[in-house]
């Protein structure tokens, strides 16, 4: 029991009390349910790998998005990780392909471009016919650094754009922080 | 005492308990302090009016921003109210002039452009030499409607732009709502 609680506690966002509650809940479930849980854990770990093209999570050598013939070729959206890719998919606004970098450049943490899937991205751009690369990276120092780096690197090959930073929908100017408001002013667009 | 508590309770964001605490606090202050408070209240109400040019709050016929010779002429930033103007001033990024509309177009609430200071804005644009109007309105249905209306109205006279809508600084793609993320994608800019 203590071992199970300990395992739950290692998960992000789960403290000792929640871990205990989850463990106790599972102990009250039928044997079969526990087996299914354990199986799902093992299967996920062994079967889910990375798409060999875009590096999104995938059980097959090529992920569903890369295989989908209805998605537009020629436009690649670059994201830091699969979570960001899934967030963009939820908008149903982007119909091109993706490339998962596997992180952001962060000199403070010793993460340089060589630790990310940058070479693979350049290779894709030289092999496929790419007209636009959209950088969808977080508005942070690391995101800015990575966007700047990739922008310089890729501009000779195709047009490079970056998602907009500014006021989020439904927000009030009055409560926006100054950096966001400055960026929104700076990034103004013709009506 | 009850009357004072009642007055405080009418203020936005102040409930009965806070109102009581404020009233009790004031009763413990020296007589002089209470007089200064009352004077400030009366003076604000009688002396603070609107700038005749931009309609920002001002004790004089022309506000400090309109009088300031160091601010750039030719660029007008249009805001809904003085609170939004003050938020933009805090960024120290905008050095032009302002125009306070006095609200946003809202057909649901029966607020049409004739109730806002639109005629005054058009007049300013035809009298002064204006090269750009920046619409700094909230990202909402009302803000969008007003931006669309003003965009069509003013485009024959000068270039009209709108502040950027997208991811706020320091936010995570993963937690952004879908509409904000869609707008950020749509509003992407060349790197």
UniProtKB/Swiss-Prot annotation, chains A, B:
<keyword id="KW-0227">DNA damage</keyword>
<dbReference type="Pfam" id="PF21176">
    <property type="entry name" value="RecR_HhH"/>
</dbReference>
<comment type="function">
    <text>May play a role in DNA repair. It seems to be involved in an RecBC-independent recombinational process of DNA repair. It may act with RecF and RecO.</text>
</comment>
<dbReference type="InterPro" id="IPR000093">
    <property type="entry name" value="DNA_Rcmb_RecR"/>
</dbReference>
<dbReference type="GO" id="GO:0006310">
    <property type="term" value="P:DNA recombination"/>
</dbReference>
<dbReference type="GO" id="GO:0006281">
    <property type="term" value="P:DNA repair"/>
</dbReference>
<keyword id="KW-0233">DNA recombination</keyword>
<dbReference type="Pfam" id="PF02132">
    <property type="entry name" value="RecR_ZnF"/>
</dbReference>
<dbReference type="Pfam" id="PF13662">
    <property type="entry name" value="Toprim_4"/>
</dbReference>
<dbReference type="InterPro" id="IPR006171">
    <property type="entry name" value="TOPRIM_dom"/>
</dbReference>
<dbReference type="InterPro" id="IPR034137">
    <property type="entry name" value="TOPRIM_RecR"/>
</dbReference>
<dbReference type="InterPro" id="IPR015967">
    <property type="entry name" value="Rcmb_RecR_Znf"/>
</dbReference>
<keyword id="KW-0234">DNA repair</keyword>
<keyword id="KW-0862">Zinc</keyword>
<dbReference type="Pfam" id="PF21175">
    <property type="entry name" value="RecR_C"/>
</dbReference>
<protein>
    <recommendedName>
        <fullName>Recombination protein RecR</fullName>
    </recommendedName>
</protein>
<keyword id="KW-0479">Metal-binding</keyword>
<dbReference type="InterPro" id="IPR023627">
    <property type="entry name" value="Rcmb_RecR"/>
</dbReference>
<dbReference type="GO" id="GO:0003677">
    <property type="term" value="F:DNA binding"/>
</dbReference>
<feature type="domain" description="Toprim">
    <location>
        <begin position="74"/>
        <end position="168"/>
    </location>
</feature>
<feature type="zinc finger region" description="C4-type">
    <location>
        <begin position="51"/>
        <end position="66"/>
    </location>
</feature>
<comment type="similarity">
    <text>Belongs to the RecR family.</text>
</comment>
<keyword id="KW-0863">Zinc-finger</keyword>
<dbReference type="GO" id="GO:0008270">
    <property type="term" value="F:zinc ion binding"/>
</dbReference>
